[in-house]
Amino acid sequence: MKFVDEAIIRVEAGNGGSGCVSFRREKYVPDGGPDGGDGGDGGSVYLQADENLNTLITFQFERFHIAERGKNGRGRDCTGHGGEDLILKVPVGTRAIDNDTEESLGDLTTHGQKLLVAKGGFHGLGNTRFKSSTNRAPRQKTLGTDGEVRSLKLELLLLADVGLLGMPNAGKSTFIRSVSKAKPKVADYPFTTLVPNLGVVNPRPGQSFVIADIPGLIEGAADGAGLGVQFLKHLERCRVLLHILDVEPIDGSDPVESARAIVGELEKHSPKLAGKPRWLVINKADLMLEEELQERIDHIVKELEWDGDVYTISAYNREGTAELAVKLLDFIASLPPEEEVDADAEVEFKWDNYHQSANESVNEDFDDDFDDDFDEDDYDVEIIYQR
């Protein structure tokens, strides 16, 4: 299935049902009083994470999603049925953003997690709600409010512990093949990798981590060049980044300048991403003699002013890859646990406090001198004033 990691959709929560103006009419009960019921609340729209999904492609063809409207209230104190909530299934790792305000509504990082993205309209109140000692035949009601309408931008961010960075043909896909069961395409031309790939690494029995491979970066990627910049967001949730550096590029480019270009693109895209722990991994060590290799590594470390750990591997021959995987596992285990995001936290919705202000405004409209004893329908059949 085609990998799609972005989609823009429109969600509309259901409108609330309106209240009813009705009066009880029975034989020998001339003044039965009000019995108009409330309307039903409109259905809300939720996103729910589903581990069985891995792409947002379905939302490219279904862009409009509308929840059910609440039913209107009826006589005999019958409350309208609430609208059914609409639940949209999305892959685990999806982020919801308000496309108009760029406000982040939340992330769905665990299977079954739900996120409210459009709140249903509040129900209208029937005239029974407005009866009092001074207003015994109220003809007031409130209408149901409109449901929330949002234009949503859905972004799928892959959940991985380790992310791979590097120029095209640096050997990232070969590395992920050497340490996991993932089988991304490998060839001797740039941009062989067109979409992100995930692999599960098992350095020890019962212990594992997830590694993500994205298309290679080139200079100017933050400004739209190449493919990698649009996939950098998939590294935002990684705990550590592996900077794969080709010690002997096939095009004769300088590894130092390539490394600097990658760091520059990271800083342009996201300072937070650039500040993540980053390990330098020198790949294709089998292409040089040992003495030349060490001189090249010393030169690279000196020019980059690198003060962190440096690992030398040959992903093709799987030399040093198993040891690196074990060190990654130990490093990830030593990191403090990530802060848990409150799954119940909700953003502010426009109708949160509407019913309070609606009740206050209706009550202010009452006149104490209103003749509530008079009713032109006292000697007629039941009449329901219902919109």
Curated annotation (Swiss-Prot):
Residues that coordinate or bind Mg(2+): 173, 193
SUPFAM superfamilies attached to this UniProt entry: Obg GTP-binding protein N-terminal domain, P-loop containing nucleoside triphosphate hydrolases
Subcellular localization(s) per the UniProt record: Cytoplasm
OBG-type G domain ranges (all copies): 160-333
Cofactor dependence: Mg(2+)
Gene3D superfamilies: GTP1/OBG domain, P-loop containing nucleotide triphosphate hydrolases
Pfam families membership: GTP1_OBG, MMR_HSR1
GO process terms (BP): ribosome biogenesis
Domain of life the protein comes from: Bacteria
Chief location bin: cytoplasm
Keyword Ubl conjugation tagged: no
Gene Ontology annotations for the cellular component aspect, listed alphabetically: cytoplasm
Transmembrane stretches, start-end: none
A GO molecular-function annotation: GTP binding
NCBIfam families the UniProt entry points to: Obg_CgtA, PRK12297.1, PRK12299.1
Subunit organization: Monomer.
PANTHER family per the UniProt record, alphabetical: DEVELOPMENTALLY REGULATED GTP-BINDING PROTEIN-RELATED, MITOCHONDRIAL RIBOSOME-ASSOCIATED GTPASE 2
HAMAP family: GTPase_Obg (MF_01454)
UniProt protein name: GTPase Obg
Classification lineage: Bacteria, Pseudomonadati, Pseudomonadota, Gammaproteobacteria, Alteromonadales
